[in-house]
Amino acid sequence: RQLPELNIFISIKFNSNNMSTIHIGIIREGKTPPDFRVPLSPAQCQQLEKQYPNVKVTVQTSPIRCFSDAQYTEIGLSVQEDLSHCDLLLGVKEVPKAQLIAHKTYLFFSHTFKKQPYNRALLQEILDKKIRLIDYEVLKDANNKRIIGFGRYAGVVGAYNAFLTYGLKTGAYSIKPAHLCSDRKEVEAELKKVVLPPDFKLVLTGYGRVGNGAREIVKLLPIKEVDPDTYLHEQHNEAVFTHLDTHQYFCRKTDAGFDKSEFYTQPELY
């Protein structure tokens, strides 16, 4: 598939206008607990080099990445520990302070944009090392919509692991944790093992990325969707769920009304 967001990476202007080759490094995720994800798959790296002949991708060696080092080397990519020659370094989650290379350009989710106090020291280290940070969270298109976000898969994985936990609690079935599934196909195969009692009831809230991601998982299961009134007031002889929008589980304290714009700007009224 096409990767239009890669144009953003390549369009970044570096300090040297005479640079004939742009070196992009794929860093090893360093957070604890370990994160298996990677910003670009082997196929995407290959596509990137093909689309932009002046781009060379180097992958930092990793024993835990969802794609093995061999999968990158097999298609001709360089896999090594040292990425100090790279102009642009791509990761997924926060980079440990000790692993930050001074005077480089990084792309990753830093979780500092909202002034998160737990990453204040990370942001200070970035400033001290004169690093240019491009945070995926703030990359937007011409319509001011985010280009990159993991909300959907947060919903997918969260819902999957909720059913994993339900199986552990009841002993009715057993499925492997989401992070041990190799792909979406295996996730769906595992879900076929789920067995639910006829009195099982579930409520989904919200139609954002996370809510819709969770809905994807629920719709794969033998659970009938019903409207909220039916859910509350009728008897059911099968597993059911209902999906609530914001106005269905929040109301104004004074008159039980709802105004969406007011709710988001003055949530304390609800």
Regions flagged by a language model, labelled:
Residues 1-18:
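Short, Lys/Arg-enriched N-terminal segments with co-localized hydrophobic residues
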Residues 20-125:
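An N-terminal-biased, well-structured beta-alpha scaffold segment characteristic
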Residues 23, 97-200:
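Glycine/serine-rich phosphate-binding loop and adjoining beta1-alpha1 elements at the start
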Residues 25, 76, 155, 206-211:
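Glycine-centered flexibility sites
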Residues 34-52, 56-59, 177-270:
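Glycine-rich phosphate/diphosphate-binding loop of Rossmann-like nucleotide-binding domains
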Residues 46-49, 79-81, 110-113, 128-131, ...:
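Short, surface-exposed linear patches
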Residues 79, 106, 133, 239-243:
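Conserved beta-strand scaffold positions in the cores of enzyme catalytic domains, especially
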